[in-house]
Amino acid sequence: MKNLKLFLLGLMLCAALPSQAWDRTRHDAIAYIAECNLTPRAKRNIARYLDHSIVYYASWMDKYRDTPEFRNLEHVSYVDADMQLVDTLRKGKTNCVVELMHAIDRLKDYRNMSDSLVRLNLMYVIHIVGDMHCPSHVKYPGCKSGRADLNGKKMSYHAMWDWGVLDGAHGWSYSEYRLLLDTFSKREKAGMAKGTPREWLYETAVACRVIYDWQRADGTYGKQFVTDTYLLPERQLILASYRLAAVLNDLFG
């Protein structure tokens, strides 16, 4: 009973994320590519704690993002002027990447944890490794989202990088992302997956700061903009996939 209460408390705690990164298709694509790069042993061990494929849980946290009771987790990753993760935020809030690192640390001892807590932390890792690579989920000093019109569709500039640009470029299903993007050699995949969540966030912050240089005063973006920019979120998606696989293989493989 105590473990169940802890699980439910943790679930409500993680429900604090008020805005999603990527959308379901992109989250599913990241998880599916990661799953296809898991070792057999990692797959077997993970299956002990999850009832379905990791794809099933890829966007679970977004379902709870509007829950008002808990606001202690930030849904974006704050960085400072040097593109470094800001660990301590205002009013006691916690950077979600910091909590991700805590979840990974806890899972290193998963054999001595209750099944429900392993499941919760595993679901958290699956979601946030994807989230942290989304171009619009790095919060830079002085940068704001604003409104946007992409090929006649009204949305936020934030949402353009969650899904708008990639939808405009491809319109692929999550399985098509795997078929068409998971084409790197074993050595290339290992190179992309090197590092830690803190280092990955720094790389993401450096790579994705340019989206605010691309922001237009009139908020209007067309097909040429998509053509010129889609490789950035596409690259972030594949990095997230291989890094998620690396984390899970390291923990459960």
Cite the ranges covered by each PLM segment.
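Bacterial N-terminal signal peptides that target proteins for export
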Residues: M1-L8
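Hydrophobic h-region of N-terminal signal peptides that target proteins for export
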Residues: L11-S19
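N-terminal, motif-rich segments that launch catalysis or mediate targeting to/interaction with membranes
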Residues: P18-I128, P135-G253
